[in-house]
């Protein structure tokens, strides 16, 4: 045996020699441990090594191991200038879009960004990353990204990296724990390998890369050099070792035979008193109901698995709490954990759903309690006073005012008032319709395709609200004046040179003798065409005559463009000192001290200096939870009614509780909709009036008789009579959303807003994009005139509603002709003519998938759902005006779209039911189509559910109960 151990020792010595040679090879590559840089001296030395390597070596490797919580990321490594924070090199992980961003300064001094595709690394598990920066001594730079030892992406022919400053003390190395946008998880290692191969870099992070020929030959050569002199000796020793094992095997066999004879003799000897051994499973040592099986191993038995709903080793079992492990019930508090199982309590009041109970975590995860809202307004015959408004909300309902045409309240009842049908004569024009106002007055409005004051109406070819010829109106109403552009919509009637021809149809709008297509100041006379900069705007109309600024943006409207204005927002603080350069904030409040003022900070309470907002929902990524219980587009942490959809977030008394879930909106002590102890309902729900004075006993208090929301705009002209925050249609303030932000030839839309925000023009043949207003709505009526003012294009345009973020919105879009999209990657998309209504719920967000899905006429799984399409399959006509009317009631999922050509309705979606978005913002949409006009835009708050919805609601309830 001693000789055998000697042979084994010799073999181990040989193997250790090989391992030692490999280990020595690993140490040949210089490595900088970034996490170990503790003082300035160490940092300077590291920068000097790195700077020399970037000049003399071909490759440098960034290596790290880390953990990231779901959807979080940050900067992994960065090289910055200590004096001005200039980036030399920065590597950041963008987990929400599964990308690694590499930013570096090129030799020409400009910042270059490379987006590299990465698998999901934000899952809470350990991850390894290697970034190879190659081609350092060549004309072009190359990048290779390895995630968990596999090549994830690469980029070739990149511009070279700029040299680091000669003075190493000017450069600061920041790791993910010290960067501005720090890593949100934990970082175990962060190293820089200076030179070497991918295999050697992999060896430093325990990544056994295969196929690296150079590394393989090095190791193989070393093994041969070490084993070459010992091969014969090693073979001889192994032969001896094999002989010893054979002899040992024979000895063991003899011992087994002898022990068997002794055992049989003992068992057959009755005098010894041995008896049949008792069963280890009697009595059953296992948990009640668990099977027992005898074994030869200690303790002589083995228990089966614990019963369903329990966990343990079979001997001891304890109950599993399915409520905490799986949360199967509609609300966490409704789950009751029982011995071996769980039971869900009944659905909350105002909701309906089948009972649910079961056993085990797997069952609880695969079966969820479903509770659907009961529409008391439909199911309860007398939920509210007859002829009053009943508003269904999730789990309940509330009673509003009397319906249009009735007067009174919930206590006294609602009685008929003067109405259009009860009039002894019709005061409206034959081409107009009667409209009942909130206060009971009657007014007239011209039908679509006609314009005037309602009492007198004339033909309106371009449907912009002005008649083709002037009308003899008694009140000299402005909409009785002749349209200065009969065939091109221009609801603002702009006429720069006052020649009676509107700017939209005037070939020389400013009257300077130079045609618009050649004029560098289309609306300002400038015969000399002087242009001191290079932005295509002449000095006479350029708000920055000596500084190029294509967008001519002027945030503070002081006549000086942002590009040359040292105080862009006009708050008295210069841009270089202003923590919100484009939003007035003279107090400069900055609660999270991230250098961005609260007035413009997308996360005012959490530091986020980069202000990234991937999904364009106006909430920064670092504080964006995407948890929205009621689906109204506001995450629960920012929602003033987290369980009731209320996109408008109206809070009339500023008590932090939204009006839709506040029993006393104006905080005057009078309940809004129900009488409590003889008090209420409030006859002025939004204006404090404890005395409830109502001189004419019409059910509306004196203080809100003609201005219900007290916003100084009479209800007759107020587009939202029950919201003091919205008074007129206005898109002058809007958010631009680019739906395909990456591409070879990126052309973004150019939006021009006219007529005080009631007309929008898009001039470019652009990539898909949106212009979205900042006002969010619950129920809304949205209408406008659509006109393509060109004959050279045939693509898509339309309007949007229910916008919550760049992955969640509704779009009404129209294509002129059938066409296959010219980029077949990631999939072939076919557009068809005809008006379409789509619900966008995109898993990927802005990019090539959403782009092709919008172009495609049908459904695209995980991206876009087609809700309705005009069966006529008719495209829009060049230079032809159309009027669309849209109604959306998100509380019940009601959607209806109507389209008019002239005065004739040519398309009607009928009632469409969809609850993908429970409210949101409004805007317009374009995709590869130029010269689009959205004119005479109007929106109006309206939560009243139309009568044509009732039959659809019954069908929905019947389907749920079955």
Swiss-Prot record:
Coiled coil: none
Alphabetized GO MF terms: calcium ion binding; heparin binding
One BP term from GO: somite development
Cross-referenced Gene3D superfamilies: 1.20.5.10, 2.60.120.200, Laminin, TSP type-3 repeat
Domain TSP C-terminal: 732-946
GO cellular component: collagen-containing extracellular matrix; extracellular region
UniProt-listed PROSITE patterns: EGF_2, EGF_3, EGF_CA, TSP3, TSP_CTER
Keywords for this protein: Calcium, Cell adhesion, Disulfide bond, EGF-like domain, Glycoprotein, Repeat, Signal
Domain EGF-like: 277-318, 319-358, 373-412, 416-458
Bias kind Basic and acidic residues: ranges: 631-641
Signal peptide: 1-23
Region (Disordered): 548-704
Pfam family, one: EGF_CA
Comp. bias regions, Acidic residues: 557-570, 652-669
Residues with attached carbohydrate: 313, 409, 646, 710, 942
Residue intervals of the Laminin G-like domain: 24-196
Ranges occupied by TSP type-3 repeats: 459-493, 494-529, 530-552, 553-588, 589-611, 612-649, 650-692, 693-728
Disulfide bonds: 281-292, 286-303, 306-317, 323-335, 329-344, 347-371, 377-390, 384-399, 402-414, 420-434, 428-444, 446-457, 473-480, 485-505, 521-541, 544-564, 580-600, 603-623, 641-661, 684-704, 720-941
UniProt cross-references to CDD domains, sorted A to Z: EGF_CA
Superkingdom of the source species: Eukaryota
Subunit structure as annotated in this protein's UniProt entry: Oligomer; disulfide-linked.
Protein task: Adhesive glycoprotein that mediates cell-to-cell and cell-to-matrix interactions. Can bind to fibrinogen, fibronectin, laminin and type V collagen.
Family per record: Belongs to the thrombospondin family.
Protein name in UniProt: Thrombospondin-3a
Source organism of this protein record: Danio rerio (Zebrafish)
Lineage: Eukaryota, Metazoa, Chordata, Craniata, Vertebrata
